[in-house]
């Protein structure tokens, strides 16, 4: 699974871009944090990340880069953070824009260490406000979920949630409108998430490119159906195995 994710990440960053809507909600930020945390097995490190401690070590450097990517806040082409979107997240949450936000501007060399170095001073100065802005506390996260009962609850499997109430149909009598989004094969606009797809073991870059092309011209959740069907036709067993892993994870931490 890690190999699949790595290849997906590579493809998205060197190929297609993505630009998610801002502000992000608590479901979307939680997905970003948990996806990146699952790549680490050292419980001592994970405990620090869970409490928003970012020590100066190699694993944390890449964790920071991973989170910025999965929040849609890192531009591969410019090798820089999307500071205007960070500002929008703060504003949307009623949090004052930090005076040192502009310190996050500017190109990096794209390495984990460079992105960490660009981030850490701002992070240390504003960690409490960052946690509020990005729903990084249990209280803020739970408040959002209580106010948004249509979102998949924490601790509920994606498969169960999407099966209930015919959620898979979406608004266009689709087959995978709900699960394709919660597995993050597609974004909230049903556009393929290139780096996510590259993470799926058993598919070549060419397979992913071809399946993304199958979505061209499709509207709404019909695009996610076309993507899913293409992947299934390419390698049904690999797709099933990958989604089973994601489904099991969704019952534990997302």
Curated annotation (Swiss-Prot):
Leukotriene C4 binds at residues 52, 136, 154. Thromboxane A2 binds at residues 49, 63, 154. Keywords: Disulfide bond, Hemostasis impairing toxin, Platelet aggregation inhibiting toxin, Secreted, Signal, Toxin. Gene3D superfamilies: Pheromone/general odorant binding protein domain (1.10.238.20). Its main location: secreted. InterPro entries: PBP/GOBP (IPR006170), PBP_GOBP_sf (IPR036728). GO terms for cellular component: extracellular region. This is Long form salivary protein D7LC. It comes from Phlebotomus papatasi (Sandfly). The gene is D7LC.
């Amino acid at each position: 699974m890690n190999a699949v994710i790595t290849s997906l990440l590579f493809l998205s960053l060197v190929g297609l871009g993505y630009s998610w809507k801002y502000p992000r909600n608590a479901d979307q930020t939680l997905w970003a944090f948990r996806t990146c945390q699952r790549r680490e097995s050292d419980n001592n490190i994970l405990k620090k990340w869970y409490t928003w401690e970012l020590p100066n070590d190699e694993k944390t450097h890449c964790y920071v880069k991973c989170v910025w990517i999965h929040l849609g806040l890192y531009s591969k082409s410019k090798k820089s953070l999307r500071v205007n979107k960070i500002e929008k997240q703060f504003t949307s949450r009623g949090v004052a824009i930090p005076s040192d936000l502009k310190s996050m501007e500017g190109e990096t060399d794209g390495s984990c260490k460079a992105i960490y170095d660009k981030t850490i001073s701002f992070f240390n100065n504003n960690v409490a406000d960052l946690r509020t802005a990005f729903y990084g506390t249990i209280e803020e996260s739970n408040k959002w979920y209580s106010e948004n009962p249509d979102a998949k609850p924490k601790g509920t499997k994606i498969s169960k949630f999407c099966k209930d109430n015919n959620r898979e149909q979406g608004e266009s009598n689709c087959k995978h409108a709900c699960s394709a989004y919660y597995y993050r094969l597609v974004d909230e606009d049903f556009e393929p998430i290139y780096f996510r797809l590259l993470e799926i073991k058993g598919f070549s870059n060419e397979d992913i490119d071809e399946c993304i092309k199958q979505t061209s011209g499709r509207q709404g959740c019909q695009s996610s159906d076309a993507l899913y069907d293409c992947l299934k036709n390419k390698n049904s067993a690999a797709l099933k195995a990958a989604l089973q892993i994601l489904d099991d994870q969704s019952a534990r931490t997302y």
